[in-house]
Amino acid sequence: MTSPSTQGRRGMLALSVACALALPLGAHAQSSTKGSTREQQLEQRVNQLEQQLAELKAMIQEQKAATSQATQTAQAAQATAQAASTKVEAAPAAKPAFSSAPGVSVALHGFISASGFGQDKTFTYGNGQNAEIPAVPAKANSGALSGVDVRNTRFWLDFTGAKLNENWSGSGRIEMDFFGGFNGTGAYAQQQPTPRLRQAYMDLVNASGGTTVRVGQEWDLLFPLENTPTSLSHIAFPLGFGSGLIGWRYPGVIWMQDLNHGADGPKWRLDVGAFEGSWNGPGSTINYLTAGNAHFQPQVEARLHVADKDWLAYFVVHYASLDMKGVGNTVAKPIKDSINSIGYELSGQWKPGPWTFKGLIYSGNALGQVFGAMSQFGDISETGGWVQGSYNFTPKWSVNAFYSMVSPNKDDVVRWVATTPTSNALLKDQQAALSLQYASGAYEFGVEWIYDKLRYQTGPEGERKNINGNQVSLNGLYRF
C-alpha cells in the first residue's frame, strides 16, 4: 500500500508538470525586448521539471517493485501454510499396515475364541474345544474335569491383486490356529498352545470365464466348508467330526468351473480335485511312507455344487487306491494287499425366514484318512451323517439343535481294529448338541451342551458296551 506522504509528493510533481506545460503560452504574450531573458528562464525551468519528472518515474517503479515483492511473500506464506495443513491431515495414512509385492494388497482377518467348559468324561481327540467322542475304556477315562480353552483362535492373511497375464489374476491365503500341540509337557505347557498350519494355497482366477484353479494345502471336497454345523465351542473340530462329518485338509490342486457363468437363477459349479495320498501307516506318517504314498496314487474327488439365494446343495464322489504293503513292500502279509477308498456324499442347506436347516449324509468304505469311521483305518464300510436346525427368534438371539450318527460295519471294525485283546473297536456313535447364542457386531456369546453316546468292544471277542459323555461350555468369540 502507498503511504500518504508519497501520494503528496506525487501530486506536487504532477502539478509542477502541468504548470510547465502552461508556461510557453505565457511566454508568447511577452514583449520582444524581454524574449531572450525569458527563454533562458524557461529553459532552466524545463530542465528542472524534467529532472523532477524523472524522479517521479523512479518513485513509481520503486512502489511497483515493493508491491510485487509483498504479493510474492504473501503467496509463499499461504502456500507454506497450506502444505503444512495438508501434511498434518495426511499423516495418519502415510504408510500401509502391510507391505508386499508391488500391486499386491494384504489383509489380516481371524477371530479370538475362548471356551470355559466342564466334562464328566475324557474325550478322544482331546478335551475342551476338540472333544468329540468319549475315550475308552470307560473305567480309565471316567471322572469330571474342567478348564478354559482358546485353541480355536485363528488368523489368516489374504493376498490379492497379483496378475498372471491379461486374463488371469492371482490371490492366496495362509491360515493358522493353535491346535499344534503344546510347548512340551511341563507344568506350564498347557498354557502355551503351539500354532499349526491349516491352509496355504494360491488361486489363479479367470473372472471372465468363471474359472478358479487352487494349488496348495486346502480342504478336500468332502468337507462341508460352507455348510459346517453352527457352534461357538467346536470350530476347528466341528460338531460330529469323525461321527457323521468327514473331510480333511491335504496338499493338492482343485479346478473350479462355473457351469452357467453370468446367467440368472441358481449358480452351478463343478469342482475336481486331486490330493496327496495318505493313511495311518505302515511307514512314517510324517515322511510320505504310508500306504497312500506308495507309488503315485492321489486321492481324486469331484463335486457338483448348486446354490441360490436361500439354499445350496452339492454331491461329492471320492476315490483313492491304497497299497497296504507300503512303500518298498515293507509289510509282507497285510490283511489285504490293496484297498479302494470310495465315498459318496450329499449335503444341503435351506434358510426359510428365521430358520436355517443344514446337514449331509454319506456312505463309503476305507475313509479313515478323511476322519471316517471315527478315525479308524481299514477296509471298513460305513454310513453316517448329521443334521442341524437353527432358529433366530430375534436378529441377535438364536437357538441351535444338532444330531449326528456314524455306523461302521461292526465286523469290518473288529477285523481291522480289534487285533489284540486290549484293542478297542468303536462300533457306533451318536452325538447331540443344543446351544443358545447371542451375536452383536463382531462379538458372539453362547452356552452349549454336548452329549455323545458310543458303543465299543475291547478285543476281537470282547463284550460290546456303551459309554456316554457330556460337556457344558460358556463361549465367547471376537471376529476381526
Which residue stretches match the model-derived regions?
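N-terminal periplasmic/intermembrane-space "pro-region" immediately following the signal or transit peptide
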Residues: 2, 19, 25-125
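Bacterial N-terminal signal peptides that target proteins for export
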Residues: 2-14
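Outer membrane beta-barrel
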Residues: 94-280, 296-297, 301, 305-312, ...
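Outer-membrane beta-barrel translocator domains and adjoining extracellular loop/strand segments
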Residues: 122-127, 183-193, 226-232, 280-294, ...
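Transmembrane beta-strand segments that form the barrel wall of outer-membrane beta-barrel proteins
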Residues: 169-180, 272-276, 316-321, 371-372, ...
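Detector for outer-membrane/organellar transmembrane beta-barrel domains
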Residues: 295, 302, 306-434, 438
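Extracellular low-complexity, Gly/Ser/Thr-rich intrinsically disordered linkers
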Residues: 428-455
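Outer-membrane beta-barrel "beta-signal"
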Residues: 438-440, 466-480
